[in-house]
Curated annotation (Swiss-Prot):
Note: The thiolation reaction likely consists of two steps: a first activation step by ATP to form an adenylated intermediate of the target base of tRNA, and a second nucleophilic substitution step of the sulfur (S) atom supplied by the hydrosulfide attached to the Fe-S cluster.
GO biological process, any: tRNA thio-modification
CDD domains reported for this sequence: TtcA-like (cd24138)
Organism: Bartonella henselae (strain ATCC 49882 / DSM 28221 / CCUG 30454 / Houston 1) (Rochalimaea henselae)
Protein name listed in UniProt: tRNA-cytidine(32) 2-sulfurtransferase
SUPFAM superfamilies attached to this UniProt entry: Adenine nucleotide alpha hydrolases-like
EC number: 2.8.1.-
Subunit structure: Homodimer.
Pathway linked to the protein: tRNA modification
PANTHER family per the UniProt record, alphabetical: AMINOTRAN_5 DOMAIN-CONTAINING PROTEIN, SULFURTRANSFERASE-RELATED
InterPro entries assigned: Rossmann-like_a/b/a_fold, TilS/TtcA_N, tRNA_Cyd_32_2_STrfase, tRNA_thiolation_TtcA_Ctu1
Catalysed reaction, written as an equation: cytidine(32) in tRNA + S-sulfanyl-L-cysteinyl-[cysteine desulfurase] + AH2 + ATP = 2-thiocytidine(32) in tRNA + L-cysteinyl-[cysteine desulfurase] + A + AMP + diphosphate + H(+)
UniProt KW Iron keyword: yes
Cited Gene3D superfamilies: HUPs
Length: 282
């Protein structure tokens, strides 16, 4: 009894040391372990991809989904603890989707005094005008969104755009490229855009989607569903997601093994002559 009381008091003290966004988080051992695990994954990505050398001001994309909310909260936590020496600017791009609740994100960000910018660009009409209803919108929508986020990052003097893609997104993209694109490619933890003036960072590349889902529910984020792409059936990414779920169900731990494989590439054991000089192999 006394030991449990001490543990509860310890968790309460630790909660007081967190960013204000965590003040409604549960004071439980389970949540504390989850938060620490996610922070550990992020710090590992920082180290593996030298993310902290990516400038002093980051634009963190906030869609209103579980992953971007979670990423923002965890980055703010690290900054609060003095472990992330960068300025953070949250940014939501309102793409003109019908029924998009315009008040939710500003209210959320203002309630915690989080620096932010809300930008309106009607890319929804562009996507629906250019594509017939049988085509998937995700690719074009993503390109338009990314272009606008690059512009905003430049206008705000940011050196990096930070995105909320997690481990499962990386694996789904890898298999989409493998099955449908005929190439070995996934999502890097860090890259430079085509213009060469902005970094793109993905601090959640080692974080499991399941953990992000649990974290989001515990934090009670006001989630905004994607009415544009979520209403379409038969998307390739959904098929990859279900395939990976089935693999993980039958062989637990395979997703982590796959991520390790993406960090352990042997060009000499593949068939791409651009990356290994087979001709001069004697």
């Amino acid at each position: 009894m006394e030991e449990n009381l001490e543990r509860t008091e310890s968790l309460a003290r630790e909660a007081d040391d967190c960013h204000p966004i965590f003040r409604i988080a549960p004071s439980t051992v389970e949540f504390n372990k989850l938060r620490k695990r996610l922070l550990r994954h992020i710090r590992q990505a920082f180290d593996d991809f030298s993310m902290l050398s990516s400038g002093k001001k980051w634009l963190v994309a906030l869609s209103g989904g579980k992953d971007s909310y979670g990423l923002l909260a965890l980055l703010l936590d690290l900054k609060w603890r003095g472990l992330l020496p960068v300025e953070i600017l949250a940014c939501n791009l309102d793409q003109g989707q019908p029924g998009f609740p315009k008040h939710i994100l500003p209210d959320f960000l203002n309630s915690y005094q989080i620096p932010h910018r809300i930008e309106y660009q009607d890319t929804y009409s562009i996507v629906t005008d250019k594509l017939v209803h049988t085509q998937t919108y995700c690719s074009l929508c993503s390109r338009l969104r990314r272009g606008n986020l690059y512009r905003i990052a430049r206008e705000e003097g940011c050196s990096a755009l930070v995105l909320g893609h997690h481990r499962d997104d990386v694996l789904e993209t890898f298999f989409m490229n493998l099955f449908h694109g005929g190439r070995l490619a996934a999502m890097p933890g860090k890259l430079i855009n085509d213009e060469g003036d902005l970094f793109v960072l993905r601090p959640l590349v080692y974080a499991a989607e399941e953990d992000m889902e649990k974290f989001s529910q515990a934090m009670q984020f006001p989630i905004i569903p994607c009415n544009l792409c979520g209403s379409q059936d038969g998307l390739q990414r959904n098929a990859m997601k279900e395939m990976l779920k089935d693999i993980e169900r039958k062989m637990p731990g395979r997703k982590d093994t796959m991520i390790r494989a993406l960090t352990n590439v042997r060009p000499s054991h593949l068939l791409d002559k651009k990356f290994f000089d087979f001709k001069n192999l004697f």
